[in-house]
Regions:
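Iron-sulfur cluster-binding electron-transfer modules in prokaryotic oxidoreductases
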Residues: 2-160
């Protein structure tokens, strides 16, 4: 993860961001709210260049290497930037995290993907894959979230 120190010791976190197809079509507002929230909470989402659909479903066949390549491209770009990869779409998170695990642990898949992509430096699962909510929980923290709330819902009945 790429951390830079801001004024008064506050950390500025920068993540590679994989929005996914759904956040570009049906969930544009969710994407906009996540980006705005990230700014308020002191971290930046730097969108992966030329990302492609992850496929939405993890391919179980080990011979289906082509279906994993878009995820490997995104993971490799994050690695080259020295950043963790964040996504907000749960399907993308699942697919990319599983492909990353394959690249880390399954030699045949790793070799075939790297041979196909002809990367300068082979990718071997070095990137940390996070869901946006994991960043909020584990990196930003609940105390910071509470501090940044503008309109608290105290006294409101929610889902009752």
């Amino acid at each position: 993860m790429n951390l830079r120190v801001k004024e008064k010791g506050q950390q500025d976190m920068k993540y590679s961001y994989y929005p996914g197809c759904t956040l570009r079509t049906k969930a544009k507002d969710l994407d906009a709210y996540a980006r705005a929230s990230a700014k308020v909470l002191g971290f930046e989402l730097e969108e992966i260049e030329n990302w492609q659909c992850c496929g939405g479903v993890y391919p179980l066949g080990t011979d289906e290497i082509a279906t994993k390549l878009s995820s490997v491209r995104a993971l490799n770009e994050a690695k080259e930037k020295g950043q963790d990869l964040v996504t907000l779409c749960s399907a993308c998170h699942h697919v990319i995290k599983r492909v990353n695990d394959d690249m880390k642990n399954v030699e045949d898949i790793r070799t075939r993907a790297n041979n196909y992509m002809q990367l300068e430096e082979p990718y071997a699962g070095e990137t940390t894959v996070l869901h946006f909510l994991e960043v909020l929980r584990d990196r930003v923290g609940f105390d910071t979230l509470k501090e940044k709330v503008v309109n608290p819902l105290k006294g409101k009945k929610i889902g009752a």
